[in-house]
Each structure stands twice: as structure tokens, then as C-alpha cells.
Amino acid sequence: GDDVLVGGKGDDYLEGGAGDDTYIYNPGDGADTILDGGGSDTIKFGAGISKDDIVVRRAGDDIRISFKNSETDSILLRYNASNASYFIENFLFDNGETMGMQDILDLSLIGTDSDDVIYGYNADDTLRGGKGNDTLNGGEGNDILYGGDGDDKLYGGNGNDTLYGSEGNDALYGSDGNDILEGGSGNDYLEGGSHNDTYIFGRVDGADTIYDNHGNDTIKFKEGIGKENITFQRVANDLVLKYGENDTVRINNQFGGSSIEQIALASGEYITASKINKIIEDLNAYASNNGMSNISMDDMKNNPDIMQMFTSGWGN
């Protein structure tokens, strides 16, 4: 039948069964669990709860609704993250506002001002961390992840994902698929994972580090960065690119088998890993022939012969 279920105070379990059921939830009702697999079902929130008060997160196969003004109140919707037959279809608020399950699922992908942990679904999702030090997990599908402010961790998961670290010292992991990673400002760590990944860098992006040992990978520099702005330096097995006063990209183990295969500019010019290797060899020979050692990046910039080496290997 069409039942009305009121758990009241305490941590309750409510199961409406078949029919169009209504669940009543008021502030202070505790941590309740709802399981409902039939009909068109509704949660009605009492006075004091509006759309702006709720926080939604995925919890495995479930959806958890919590409340910004309470540390103890919550509603766990069993299987609502994985099986549409268990969906609660309608959410009604005392002030007349309404939401559907898709609204709830969308809200679960948006962070708060706190440190959030957000999980995507088996679809093409967009996750937004907002403020705080957030952790975003895209899961399946071709996802877009925005870290926002704070020191965030972004995991693309399966699919061709796009990861934006934005502000802060972020860590971006593409995992499977042909991913695009852009750390943004701050000193970021970027790891594309398997397949063919692209790393995007622009002015004032800070001191970033890349590790990638799979696929055919590319670094792309944004508008305003030309070949004359970029210097190369080998440090042990790493390759360090300097392209601004405080802007660098360190490619871990570039000369030990974990290489970036190509560096490209917005102009369409590019240089391959083999050409970079040749430049490094020529630079070492030049330094030896001229009695130079421990050449700094600034020394390179001020030496026209060295800069000619750096710019000569680029093609269109």
C-alpha cells in the first residue's frame, strides 16, 4: 500500500515496500536508513530543513544525506547510488522546494567549504571539490574533475578523463584512459597512468612534477609560452623544463624509461623526446669544450649559443 513512515527520534530503519510511500524526517530525527524498492516514493522534510541545508555524498552503493547544521542527523538511502529500482523519486521541503533523485545525484558531486571526499558514478560525471582539501574519484566514464581551492587529490579512474587541480598543491592521477591533466597554480604532482595522456601548463603554474611510464604522452604549453622561453636541463635521470621565473616542470625518470614523448606549443610547434636528448648531448659537449660546469638555467637563458641549441630542435 501507500504508506507513511515516521521514524522519529533515534537511529531508525524504514522500509516502505511496494506502493507510493512517504517518509517523514524532521530535524533531530537521528541517523536513519531507508530501503524502498517499489512505487513512486517521497521524503518529506520538516520545518527547519531546506535544499541549502543538505549535503549529499555517495557511500558505496548507497546515498547519504546529511545536514550542514547537524553532526548527528543523516539519511542513508540504500542502493540509491547503483540501482534505479531503489530510487526515492521525490524530495519535498517545508518551504515548498522540491528535488528529484537526479538532483540528489548531481548534488553528490559538488563539494562544500570543508574537506570533501566525492565519488562519481558509472557515467560521464563532473565533480567539483570547491574549497577545502578535497579528494575526488571519477570512477567509470569520461569524467571531468575540478579540485578548486585547497590541496586536492584527483583520481580519474577508468575512461578518458580531464582533471583540473586549480589552486593549491594538488595531486592528479589519470589512471586508465587518454587523460588530460592540468595542475593549475601551486606545486602539483601529475601522473597520467596508462594510455596517451596530455599535460597542460601555463604561466604562473609553479613547480610541477610529472611521472608517466605508459603510452605516447604530450606536454602542451598554453598561449604566451614560446620555444624561446623554455630551457632543458638533465638532473640525474629527470628532465627539468624551465619556462618562467618560478615555473618549472620536472619529468621523473625521463632518461630512465618513463619519458614524455613530445612537448607542444599553442603555436603548433613541437619537439620530440629524441630531439631533446640530442640537445642535452650538444649542451654537455658545449659545456665541456668551453670549460663550463654547473650551468644554471639563468646562465642558459643569457647565452645565445645555448639558446640556439634549445630552439633548433622544434618543428611544426
Task: State where each predicted segment sits.
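Acidic, glycine-rich calcium-binding repeat modules characteristic of RTX/beta-roll
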Residues: 1-62, 71-87, 115-119, 124-238, ...
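Low-complexity acidic/polar repeat-biased segments
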Residues: 66-108, 242-316
